[in-house]
C-alpha cells in the first residue's frame, strides 16, 4: 500500500547506538505523519542523538559469574549459561578483542573430534568466540546470543556468554520488565534446582526475543515526542498577537531576546510569532512557511553529510 499520498514520510538508516541505545544496532527507521497535521513533521518526533555508552557503563555494575551454571542469588536472569566444559579452554586465555581462533595452542582452537580425527571449526565470521571490549560500545545482539559460536557473545572477563540480564541492559529493556507470569521476587526465591528448571524451559525464548527486538529506548523517545506535540495546545494567530503585545515584541531586541530564551514554544510557533511581530513583512515577503511545506522541500534534497562548509 502506497502511503505517500496520505503521509509525510521520513526514513533513515541509523545505528541506534547514536540515539541512546546501549548497543550497536543498525536499522532503517521509518516515521510517517498524516498530511492533515500541518505543523508536525516526522523530524519533530525523530529520536535525538545521544552520546555513546561503553559496555562497562552498561553492565559493569553486575556481579561477575565465574562458575558454570551459576545463577545470581538476587537475579535469576543474571546467569552463567552452561556449555561443554572442554570449550572453556578455548576462550580462557584470550584478551579483549581476540577470538579463540587466535590461540597459538592448536588444542585451544575450536574443534570437534569425529571418528578420532580433530576437525577444526570453520572461521566464517571473525566475531565468533570473540571476547568483547569493556570500553567500547556493546555489540549488536543476535538471535543466538546463547552460544559462543555466535557473533560477539563472550563476556569481557568471564568465560561465558552474556547473561539474560546483561543482554536486556544492552537492548535497553527495563529491569522491571516481566518475562513470566511468576513474579520476579518469587522466581528469585526458588531453589537452585527450580531456577535451573525455569531457565531450561524459558531461557531460549527470552534470548531469541531479545535478539529479534527493537530497542525500547528508541520507541520510548518517539512515543514521548508524539505525546508532547499532540497534547500541546495549538498556538492560534490571536494567541501569538497577544504574546507580541504583552512582551512588546515589535521591538527587534525584545523579539530576539524572547526567541533565544523561551523554551515554552517550538520552532514553528516562534517562527509564527516572529512573522506577526514584523510590521514590514508585507513589504519584504517575510512570511512564515508551514512546517509540512518545509518538510516536503527538504525531504527531496540529498543527504548533506558529505558536504562541508568552508
Describe each PLM feature range:
Residues 27, 212-219, 290, 294:
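Short alpha-helical patches at coil-to-helix transitions and adjacent helical residues
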Residues 1, 30-34, 141, 219, ...:
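Conserved proline-anchored active-site loop of SAM-dependent methyltransferases
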Residues 78-252:
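C-terminal target-recognition/interaction regions appended to catalytic cores
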Residues 1-128:
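Class I S-adenosyl-L-methionine
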Residues 24-25, 134-137, 303:
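Short, well-ordered loop/turn elements at secondary-structure boundaries
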Residues 233-309:
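S-adenosyl-L-methionine
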Residues 14, 59, 141-142, 170-171, ...:
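Bulky hydrophobic/aromatic "packing anchor" residues in well-ordered structure
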